[in-house]
C-alpha cells in the first residue's frame, strides 16, 4: 500500500517566518526547481557554528579534536570570532585545559592537529571557505584550471570561470562574489600568511591538438 495524500491534513508543518536562533526573518529561495528556507543573517550564531565546523572538517582543513560541541564552547568563551582565530588558540592554554573533557593531553593533541593543518592543498582551502555551491570536487576543478594564490582569485571573471568543466553561471557568480568581498579579502590575506598552500599543476587546454589530423588504425567491432 502507498500513501498518496493526507486527507486529514494532520501534522502539517508551518514554515517558520523567523530563524529560531537569531530571530531574523527567513527567506525562501528557489534553486533548480526546489525551495529552501534560508536565514539571510550573516552573523547568525547557528551559521557561525556551521562555518567553523565546515572549516575544520575532514575534506577541508581536517583538524582532529574539534567536535561541534567543542567549537561551541570555544566560541561562547570568546576565543573564536573568525576561523583564523583557531591558529592562535595556544594563548588560552590554561583555560582550555581547565574545560570539562579537556586536559593537558587533549590540549596538546589539538594544538598539534592545528599545526599539522597548516600544510594544506589549495582545493581544500577553497572548499573550507564555504562558498555557496562550491564542493570539494568543484574546488579541485577550479584550482587545476586556475592554480592561483588566494589573493589572485579576486581577479577571475565569471566568463573565465565558465571555462571550467561543470561550472554554471550561478556557481561562477557565487565564486566571484565571495572573492571580491572586502571582508573576505581580509580573511584570505590572513589565511595566506598562516597556511602553506600547495598548488596543483595547471591543466593545459587541448589547443595543441587544433589543426592536426589523426589516423586511427585497426578494425572497429
Give each language-model segment a name:
Residues 1, 32-33, 49-53, 68-69, ...:
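Short acidic (Asp/Glu) and glycine-rich catalytic loops that position anionic groups and cofactors
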Residues 46-100:
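Long, charge-rich boundary regions
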Residues 48, 55, 98-221:
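DNA strand-break repair and replication-stress modules
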Amino acid at each position: 500500500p502507498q500513501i498518496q495524500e493526507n486527507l486529514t491534513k494532520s501534522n502539517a508543518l508551518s514554515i517558520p517566518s523567523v530563524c529560531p536562533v537569531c530571530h531574523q526573518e527567513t527567506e525562501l529561495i528557489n534553486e533548480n526547481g526546489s525551495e529552501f528556507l534560508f536565514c539571510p543573517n550573516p552573523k547568525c550564531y547557528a551559521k557561525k557554528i556551521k562555518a567553523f565546523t565546515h572549516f575544520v572538517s575532514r575534506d577541508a582543513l581536517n583538524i582532529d579534536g574539534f567536535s561541534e560541541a567543542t567549537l561551541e564552547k570555544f566560541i561562547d568563551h570568546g576565543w573564536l570570532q573568525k576561523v583564523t582565530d583557531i591558529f592562535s588558540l595556544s594563548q588560552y592554554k590554561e583555560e582550555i585545559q581547565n574545560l570539562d573533557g579537556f586536559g593537558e593531553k587533549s590540549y596538546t593533541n589539538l594544538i598539534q592537529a592545528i599545526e599539522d593543518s597548516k600544510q594544506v592543498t589549495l582545493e581544500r582551502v577553497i572548499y573550507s571557505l564555504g562558498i555557496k555551491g562550491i564542493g570539494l570536487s568543484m574546488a579541485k576543478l577550479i584550482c587545476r584550471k586556475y592554480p592561483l594564490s588566494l589573493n589572485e582569485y579576486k581577479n577571475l571573471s565569471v566568463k573565465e570561470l565558465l571555462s571550467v568543466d561543470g561550472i554554471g553561471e550561478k556557481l561562477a557568480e557565487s565564486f566571484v562574489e565571495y572573492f571580491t568581498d572586502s571582508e573576505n579579502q581580509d580573511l584570505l590575506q590572513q589565511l595566506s600568511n598562516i597556511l602553506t598552500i600547495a598548488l596543483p599543476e595547471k591543466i593545459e587546454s587541448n589547443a595543441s591538438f587544433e589543426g592536426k589530423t589523426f589516423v586511427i588504425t585497426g578494425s572497429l567491432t
